[in-house]
């Protein structure tokens, strides 16, 4: 009996830790992106660093689509329908304020889904197009956090390049 109690207490603590740490990771990345992108002009966020490179605007569309589909849609049940190719080819050049609002709203949706996870939910089966080998929700949240970190790094680089170009 005591062993079961200790195990349940540990799992509850683990659940609290997972929720807290995932929320922190997603918020930190979003805050970094916002702080870097806010000083830029609309023209700058749609500037290609080289002919085949992604713009900051396209990366924001991509991150919004990725998180909206894999977490808000597949786990949260939002019904989001993704058009991944458009994330990289959209020519509408939405204003920076619109992109940041969409991205920020998506981060808030992701955090709301994270906070709803119970101890059992983390190990619930997860499959989605592109994540067929994922296995469980924990791995889906982890992959999406890693993906967000990867593209946050790209945005950091692009912002530094734009800053250097503006000094020349």
Question: For each predicted feature, which ranges?
Answer:
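Generic structural signal for secondary-structure transition and capping sites
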Residues: 31, 42-45, 68, 108, ...
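Short, contiguous alpha-helical
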Residues: 5-8, 19, 23-27, 34, ...
């Amino acid at each position: 009996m005591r062993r079961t109690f200790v195990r349940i207490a540990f799992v509850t603590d683990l659940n609290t830790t997972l929720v807290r740490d995932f929320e922190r990771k997603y918020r930190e990345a979003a805050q970094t992106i916002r702080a870097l992108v806010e000083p830029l002009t609309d023209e700058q966020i749609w500037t290609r660093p080289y002919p085949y490179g992604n713009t900051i605007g396209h990366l924001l569309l991509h991150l919004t689509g990725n998180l909206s589909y894999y977490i808000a849609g597949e786990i949260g049940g939002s019904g989001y329908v993704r058009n991944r190719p458009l994330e990289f080819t959209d020519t509408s050049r939405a204003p920076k304020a619109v992109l940041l609002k969409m991205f920020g709203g998506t981060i808030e949706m992701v955090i709301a889904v994270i906070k709803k996870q119970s101890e059992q939910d983390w190990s619930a089966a997860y499959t989605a197009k592109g994540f067929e080998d994922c296995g469980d929700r924990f791995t889906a949240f982890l992959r999406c956090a890693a993906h967000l970190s990867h593209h946050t790094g790209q945005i950091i680089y692009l912002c530094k390049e734009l800053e250097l170009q503006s000094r020349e």
